[in-house]
Regions:
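Domain-level signature for soluble enzymes in the chorismate/prephenate branch of the shikimate pathway
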Residues: 1-376
Length: 376
């Protein structure tokens, strides 16, 4: 049996050859890139890559080595594509990103729309983000808010996108895909839920509770302590409070903010009833113009990928290769295709940065229905 050091020396020798061959292969890759640049061919040629993978794996008999050979060449070809994307950027041939840099968000004579009624958490987020909210109004649904932007009836819309306890607001993720609107900002506000009843009502009177589904989820433990209460979903916490006020029934209560108690003159029957004392909701500010600020530091994108082994891994490799920090990944089912998903990713960066351009170009070439949701 050979000594361990002797075996390691042989491995080092083989590794040296591998590195030399890798450098030679990448040099040939650059020639391929030059050819594709001159002919206008796309960098990613899925059929050619699959043909190549079938060929190299057929050279190996051992099942374990066959799988390893495929992974090795998948990675080699991935590195080859990334180098080609770099060359495109260096020569200024890369397709421009359809976003315009702005020194500041337009904030004069702006119209802002939010979903709900006066006192809604969306209204609070709007008031914290914008200096002037005198020309603001509310609509019934989040879709109505996005539609107002699309029709030019509003300049900005405020939408909840995620709660720290209940998770994402899935409907609004879908609306960001459906509408050609753009995220230009975000606002995080603390959520402090109260149980509100009509004047003179007591906790012992309550039989029915109204609120938004997310608010009901966020107060799950509290509601479990009152299992005899009927829970009813409403489009908005402030709408629920308004209903309780208008109905004027002692048996009804709403889960909403302290502000809505003041607005609709309701009694606070209990307070701080959310499960998480640090409960927060993130809202996004959406507009119809594809703009981003010079100091914007977060990018949101979405895309679809084939339902194949390793397809998500290959998309994420663009962030690793370009040294970009990914903050979040979510998936949403594609309604028309069972068990297939659209992925949403947030990562740090600015659309002016070359690393960001390289990563986005690669993902756009290799994924389906790629979309930049905003840089903010």
């Amino acid at each position: 049996m050979k000594d361990l050091n002797e075996i390691r020396a042989e491995i080092d020798s083989v590794d040296k050859e591998l590195v030399s061959l890798y450098e030679k292969r990448m040099a040939l890759t650059e020639q391929v890139a030059d050819y594709k640049l001159s002919t206008g061919k796309k960098v990613f040629d899925k059929a050619r890559e699959e043909e190549k993978l079938e060929k190299v794996t057929s050279m190996v008999d051992d099942p374990f080595l066959k799988r390893g050979t495929r992974e090795l060449f998948e990675h080699l070809m991935s590195m080859s594509r990334k180098r080609q994307y770099q060359k495109l950027a260096e020569k200024g041939i890369m397709e421009p990103i359809p976003f315009e840099e702005a020194a500041a968000l337009p904030d004069k004579n702006i119209r802002i729309v939010y979903q709900g009624e006066e006192g809604a958490y969306s209204q609070m987020a709007m008031q914290q983000f914008f200096h002037d909210t005198t020309n603001s109004y509310h609509v019934q649904t989040w879709r109505d808010a996005m539609e107002a932007i699309a029709k030019g009836e509003a300049d900005y819309a405020v939408l909840p996108i995620e709660n720290s306890s209940a998770g994402i607001v899935s409907e609004n993720y879908d609306l960001l895909v459906e509408y050609d609107n753009c995220i230009v900002g975000e606002q995080i506000i603390p959520i402090d839920h109260c149980l509100l009843g009509t004047k003179g009502s007591k906790l012992s009177d309550i039989e029915q509770v109204y609120s938004h589904p997310q608010a009901l989820m966020q107060c799950g433990r509290y509601l479990d302590e009152h299992r005899n209460w009927e829970k009813h979903s409403f489009k908005n916490t402030a709408m629920a409070a308004k209903k309780v006020k208008e109905d004027g029934l002692l048996r009804q209560a709403a889960i909403a903010s302290r502000l809505t108690a003041d607005i609709y003159r309701l009694d606070i029957l209990d307070e701080h009833i959310q499960d998480n004392s640090n409960n927060c909701t993130k809202f996004v500010i959406v507009t119809g113009r594809k703009i981003f600020l010079k100091n914007a530091g977060k990018i949101s994108i979405c895309f679809e990928i084939p339902h194949e082994s390793g397809s998500l891994y290959h998309m994420l490799s663009h962030f690793i290769f370009n040294d970009l920090n990914m903050n979040k990944i979510e998936s949403r089912p594609l309604g028309e295709r069972n068990w297939e998903y659209r992925f949403f990713i947030d990562f740090e960066g600015n659309l002016n940065e070359s690393a960001v351009k390289n990563a986005l170009h690669g993902i756009k070439e290799e994924a389906e229905n790629f979309k930049i949701l905003g840089n903010y």
